[in-house]
Amino acid sequence: MRLFAWVMCCLLLCGQAVQAQVRSYDQMIAAGELKVAVYKDFAPYSFEDHGQPRGVDVELAQALAKAMGVRLKLMWAPPGEKLDDDLRDYIWRSSPLHERQLADLMMRVPYDHDYAQRRNDIGELANAQVVMFGPYQQECWQVAYDRRRLDSVGSVAVFQQHPIGVEVDSVPSFYLTSVFNGMLSAKTHHYPGVSQAFKAMQAGEVDAVMAMRGEVDWQVHEAADPQLALAENAYPNMGKQRWEIGMAVHESNRQLAYAVEEALEGLIRDGSLKAVYARYGLRYEVPEMYQ
């Protein structure tokens, strides 16, 4: 019995040793530093350019920290296999891959009631330790095409004849290879990322690219090619085609969420956030909460 108690004590102590501490709002203010997790190498939202952090999410995080009177510390987050993994590693449990440091705030998290209320196999909330809040962007799917090889995109049916590029294992990939009983699959070309798909379009390998609107806007902006156009087609049988992007904090840190929401609303209403998006060539739609 004593041996069992000793083993349990050791296990508990070990668990405490590796469990990262969630900072309260007061501790964050006292430290004078807001730690924000942003996705690594995810242009135009968060990336490094000649060693300098850039991107919409980076500039928004900088503005939020400034509004709260603290400095910003970025935590570059390589995306996991699932968003649940990222929330676990950066918001509530931590990971040895980044020295078990937790972020105070994580950017680019879906602001979606159904996702937030998902249950696991035993009926518990899948992300009970996380509060998802603060929608700051509306996102949707977008097709860009080269007018030198494609006159217009009235319907995705044109991709029975014209090749289109998508990121491998993405929603556009699954959609284009399955819609219309797979009639578009032969002309759907897969690439490691959206930037590679755009390079393929510029090289003439494909006539169009489908991805998230923000990524497409950025690629078109960077290409500065007047022959690249944005389609206005619909996506039949696709399901959810528009969604909002927000942020996340630990469920015990709602005070920080309230402070961030207050700062965010000011940036949206005075046009500052729209100006950030414009600097990267992105269209900006105000989230429904602020309309």
Region locations from a protein language model:
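Extracytoplasmic small-molecule ligand-binding "clamshell" domains
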Residues: 20-109
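Periplasmic-binding protein-like
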Residues: 40, 137-142, 213, 221-261, ...
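Hydrophobic residues within well-ordered alpha-helices
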Residues: 64, 91, 159, 200-202, ...
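Ligand-binding clefts/hinges and TM-proximal coupling segments of bilobed small-molecule sensing domains
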Residues: 172-175, 228-230, 262-291
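Bilobed "Venus flytrap"/periplasmic-binding protein-like clamshell domains
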Residues: 38, 54-67, 138-183, 189-192, ...
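Extended ligand-binding regions for polar small-molecule ligands
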Residues: 58-67, 147-150, 162-163, 240-280
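Acidic, polar ligand-binding/catalytic clefts
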Residues: 74-156
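A ligand-binding cleft/hinge motif common to bilobed small-molecule-binding domains
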Residues: 107-124, 175-179, 202-203, 207-241
